[in-house]
Amino acid sequence: MPTSANKVETAWSALLAGAAETRQEHLAPSPLFILRQTLFCVLAAYLFCGAGMVWNDWIDRDIDANVARTKNRPLASGKVTTAQAFVWMALQVIASCAVLHVMLDGKDV
């Protein structure tokens, strides 16, 4: 889960995206537009963060299996297969990219 600092950075990024939209359209962005962009940005960051955590657990699964504190993690304990973890990670990445596509309204950045 993102830290508080990451959440602030994410919100700031969305506000900057709103400012960039203003410069392109020569219009002041509405508060609803800024809120929408912020929510999309937070959701995309949350999904990408989740995918990163799955990747980390996947890479560390053999080490985690030998450490008392981490041996009960789903991949380390075998409760989840590497194929299942990969599918879950891929779904999170795809969902995050879809959110970003909607957020950017199909524009290239």
UniProtKB/Swiss-Prot annotation:
Q: Name the needed cofactors.
A: Mg(2+)
Its annotated pathway reads: Secondary metabolite biosynthesis; terpenoid biosynthesis
UniProt-annotated location(s)? Membrane
GO aspect biological process, one term? terpenoid biosynthetic process
Q: Which UniProt keywords apply?
A: Membrane, Transferase, Transmembrane, Transmembrane helix
The membrane topology noted for this protein in its Swiss-Prot or TrEMBL record is: Multi-pass membrane protein
- InterPro entries (UniProt xref): Prenyltransferase, UbiA_prenyltransferase, UbiA_prenylTrfase_CS, UbiA_sf
User: Disulphide bridges in this chain?
Assistant: none
- Inducing or repressing factors: The subglutinol cluster is highly expressed when mycelia and hyphae are transferred to fresh media for a 3 hour induction period, remaining expressed under conditions of heat shock. The cluster is repressed in cultures reaching stationary phase or in early germinating cultures, as well as under conditions of UV, salt and oxidative stress.
Enzyme Commission designation: 2.5.1.-
Similarity-based family: Belongs to the UbiA prenyltransferase family.
**What functional role does this protein have?**
Polyprenyl transferase; part of the gene cluster that mediates the biosynthesis of the immunosuppressants subglutinols, meroterpenoids consisting of an alpha-pyrone (4-hydroxy-5,6-dimethyl-2-pyrone) moiety attached to a decalin core fused to a five-membered cyclic ether carrying a prenylside chain. The first step of the pathway is the synthesis of the alpha-pyrone moiety by the polyketide synthase subA via condensation of one acetyl-CoA starter unit with 3 malonyl-CoA units and 2 methylations.
Q: Identify this protein by name.
A: Polyprenyl transferase subC
Gene symbol? Answer: subC
